[in-house]
C-alpha cells in the first residue's frame, strides 16, 4: 500500500507543479520591453514621432544639431498657415498686417522692420523638395508648445482640462492593457499620470514625458481634474479694415 500512496503523492505533486506553472505563466507580469522605434514608427535616428495633443499623427519631426524642425506642410496643417516659402528667392516669409518678416534658407537670422535678428540656430532649410522650419521659429509667431523626448515630440495647440492621478506604487506602463503586454517605460510611486481613458481594470495614461500606455487601475490614486495653462506668448496683430458711414461708389463718375 505504501508504494501506491507514494506514487499517488508523486502524481499529485507533479500535477500541482504543472498547474502552478500554467497559472504562473498566465498571471505573472511580463518583463519584455517594447521596441520604441517600432512603437513610434521611426526608422531613422534623426526622426521623431509627433504626439499632437494625445494622439500620434502620421507626420514626423526632424532633429538636426539638437534643434527640432517641422516640415512646412506640418506647420501649415497643425500650427500656422501664414508661413510662405519662396523657392525661387530661397526665402521663408511670414506676413502680418504691418510687415513681412523674411529669412533666407540655411541662415540663422531673420529680418523685420526693426532690423536683423539672430536666432542662434538655422531657421529653415530645404532637403529635396521639402522645406523645414525650426520649431522655435514657428513659436515666435504661434501660440503652441512643444517638448522633445527620446523618440517623440509632444505638441499642444489646444488647452482645456484634464484628468490626473498619482501612482500608489511603482509600476510599468505597458503597450496595451494586460500583464503580458510589453513595457514602454517605468513609472514611480507618486508620479502624476494623465488619465486618457479608464476601462474596467486598466487605464490609458500619459506620463510626464508624454509616453502613452496602460497601467492597472489598482495602481492609481484618486482621479482629479486640472485646468491646463494655455500658451499666450504670441500676441496676434489685429487685422483692421476701413469703414465709412456713407455709401461708397465703386464706379467711375462720368463728366456731365
Where are these predicted regions, by residue range?
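Primary recognition of N-terminal secretory signal peptides and signal-anchoring hydrophobic helices
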Residues: 2-199, 218-254
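Short, compositionally biased
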Residues: 206-219
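Short aromatic-glycine-enriched beta-strand elements
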Residues: 200-204
Amino acid at each position: 500500500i505504501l508504494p501506491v500512496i507514494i506514487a499517488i503523492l508523486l502524481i499529485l505533486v507533479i500535477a500541482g507543479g504543472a498547474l502552478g506553472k500554467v497559472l504562473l505563466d498566465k498571471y505573472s507580469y511580463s518583463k519584455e520591453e517594447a521596441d520604441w522605434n517600432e512603437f513610434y514608427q521611426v526608422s531613422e535616428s534623426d526622426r521623431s514621432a509627433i504626439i499632437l495633443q494625445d494622439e500620434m499623427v502620421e507626420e514626423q519631426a526632424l532633429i538636426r544639431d539638437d534643434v527640432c524642425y517641422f516640415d512646412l506642410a506640418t506647420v501649415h496643417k497643425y500650427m500656422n498657415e501664414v508661413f510662405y516659402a519662396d523657392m525661387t528667392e530661397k526665402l521663408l516669409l511670414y506676413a502680418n498686417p504691418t510687415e513681412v518678416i523674411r529669412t533666407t534658407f540655411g541662415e540663422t537670422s531673420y529680418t523685420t522692420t526693426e532690423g536683423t535678428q539672430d536666432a542662434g540656430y538655422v531657421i529653415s532649410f530645404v532637403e529635396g523638395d521639402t522645406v523645414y522650419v525650426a520649431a522655435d521659429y514657428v513659436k515666435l509667431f504661434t501660440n503652441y508648445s512643444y517638448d522633445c523626448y527620446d523618440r517623440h515630440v509632444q505638441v499642444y495647440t489646444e488647452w482645456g482640462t484634464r484628468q490626473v492621478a498619482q501612482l500608489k506604487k511603482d509600476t510599468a506602463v505597458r503597450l496595451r492593457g494586460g500583464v503580458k503586454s510589453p513595457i514602454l517605460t517605468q513609472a514611480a510611486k507618486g508620479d502624476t499620470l494623465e488619465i486618457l481613458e479608464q476601462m474596467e481594470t486598466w487605464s490609458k495614461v500619459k506620463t510626464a514625458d508624454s509616453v502613452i500606455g496602460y497601467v492597472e487601475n489598482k495602481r492609481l490614486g484618486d482621479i482629479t481634474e486640472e485646468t491646463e495653462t494655455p500658451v499666450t506668448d504670441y500676441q496676434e496683430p489685429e487685422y483692421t479694415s476701413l469703414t465709412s458711414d456713407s455709401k461708397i461708389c465703386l464706379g467711375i463718375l462720368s463728366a456731365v
